[in-house]
Amino acid sequence: MVKPDGVQRGLVGEVIQRFERRGYKLVAIKMMHASEQLLQTHYEALKSLSFFPKLVAYMSSGPVVPMVFEGRKVVENGRTMLGATKPEASCPGSIRGDYCQDVGRNVVHGSDSTESANREINLWFSPQELCQYKQAVDPWIHE
């Protein structure tokens, strides 16, 4: 998901491009203003932390772009492509390493496990919003 700072900075296309160039298939995307209720559910595991109210306020301050990509090891490799949550620990070449300086404005969110990804997909998208299709390029990416 591209967070409000990433949307404001015009980085949505860059994020999509990096995943597609890696061979991942975009199957769902939308731009929306997330409700506080949705964000509280999404970040439920962080509810007891002191920065939680600030996180919810930030994430509801502007539009976000949730998206779903498919492909081999997309969650694991996607986390590497995004970079560390704290931008100062992110390697150059990662999205956060290239575009972030502050943990409070770190451009993107990515699921940390397949289980989290499934939970988050169900929070942000209805089954009808997930588009299943075959790409002509698939045989050129996967054996």
UniProtKB/Swiss-Prot annotation:
Cross-referenced Gene3D superfamilies: Nucleoside diphosphate kinase-like domain (3.30.70.141)
NCBIfam families xrefs: PRK00668.1 (NF001908)
Organism annotation: Schistosoma mansoni
Instruction: Reply yes or no: does the keyword Ion transport apply.
Output: no
What is the required cofactor set for this protein? Mg(2+)
Family per UniProt?
Belongs to the NDK family.
This chain belongs to the protein called Nucleoside diphosphate kinase
Q: Which reaction does it catalyse?
A: a 2'-deoxyribonucleoside 5'-diphosphate + ATP = a 2'-deoxyribonucleoside 5'-triphosphate + ADP; a ribonucleoside 5'-diphosphate + ATP = a ribonucleoside 5'-triphosphate + ADP; GDP + ATP = GTP + ADP
A further note on this protein reads: Schistosomes do not have de novo purine biosynthetic pathway, hence they depend solely on purine salvage pathway to supply for their need for purines.
Could you tell me which residue ranges the NDPK-like domain spans? 1-132
**EC annotation from Swiss-Prot or TrEMBL:** 2.7.4.6
